Amino acid sequence: MLMRWHHPLRQAIGHAVGVTPIVCKNTDFLSVCEYKRGMGALDRYLDEQLSRGRAYFSRNDGSLALGLGLEAFSAAATRLIVKRRLANPRRGFFLILRPEDQIIGAPDPVRWIDPLMKYLQIDYRISLLRAAAFHGSTHQAAMVFQVIAPRQLRDFNIGRHRIQFVYQGPTAFAEINQPDWLGQIKSAAGFARVAGIELTMLDAARYFRKAAGIHGVAQIVKDLGAKASPRKLAEAAEHYENTSVRRLGYLLDQANHVRQASALEPFARQAKSMKPLSPSLGQVPDSLTVLHDKDTKWKLIINEPLETEF
C-alpha cells in the first residue's frame, strides 16, 4: 500500500533539512517512509519516527526508508549507537533514545518489549517481579524485567535495565497464555502483555528462584492473594506442576486468603508424597524429615521458615 507525502508542513520541514520523504508504505512491522539520501538522513528519519509515536524500528525498515544497503545502514546506525542516539537490544532491532532515555541508556522495557517480541515472532508475557509490582506488590522493587516465553532466549543488559527471559515449554505456554488470564500494561508507546494476578502468583510459585526465593513468593502472595479470582486460579493451576500449586496453596493459607487457598485444595488431595516447601535447599532425606514441621493438608515439608509477617 503506497501513500504519497502531501502534507505541506512536513514537505516544508523535509526540504529545509535537506532530506525529502518521497513515499510511505506499510510493512508487516511498521509504516516506513523512503527518504532521499543526504547528510544526516538517518538522524532525520529517527526524528520522524518519534514524531509519529514510534521509538523503535527494524534494520530492514530503516535501510529501506533511506535507500541504503544493509551494510551501509549498519555502519550509520553504529555511529548513532556510539553517540547514544540509538540502542540495539537485539540484532536488527533498534530503539530510538530521547534525551531523557540517554541518562539510563534505554527506555523502560515496557515501552518496547511488545514490538521486540513481534519482531522476533515470539509470544510472551511479562511476569514474576515486574508483574507483581504492576499488580500492586509494593515490596517488589523490580530491578529485573522478566519475560516468560516458549523459546529459550539469552538474557541481556541494555543501559541500566536487565532483561531476563524465562523459558516455559511451548505446549504448557500455549495452554497458559490465554487472554482470560492475561492483562495489559499501558505505556505511552502502546500496550504490553502481562500475566494476570493468578498467573503472576502461579509463575512465582513455579519459578520461585527468579522471584527472590520462597520469601519473595510469600510476599507476593500476601500482597496480591486477596485480589485473585478463585475460579481463574483453579483453572490456570491445571497447567502447572502439582508441587508448585501446593506451594502456592500453602502460602495463600498462611496469608489467610481463605477463598483462594480453598480453590487449590483439590490439587493437594491428588499428591502422592510429601515435598519440600523450598526445593532450593535440596531434597530432605527421609532420616531428617523428623527435624522439620510438616503440613499434611498441602503435603509439604516446611524446610525453611517463612520470614514474611502475615
What are these regions (language model features)?
Residues 1-38:
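Short, intrinsically disordered or compositionally biased N-terminal tails of bacterial proteins
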Residues 26, 181-310:
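Hydrophobic alpha-helical interaction segments
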Residues 33, 38-123, 229-231, 235-239:
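Short beta-edge/loop segments at beta->alpha junctions of small alpha/beta modules
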Residues 67, 81, 136, 140, ...:
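Hydrophobic/aromatic-lined pockets within catalytic cores
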Residues 98, 149, 167, 196, ...:
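Pocket-edge structural micro-motifs
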Residues 110-115, 132, 147-149, 178-186:
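Short acidic (Asp/Glu) patches
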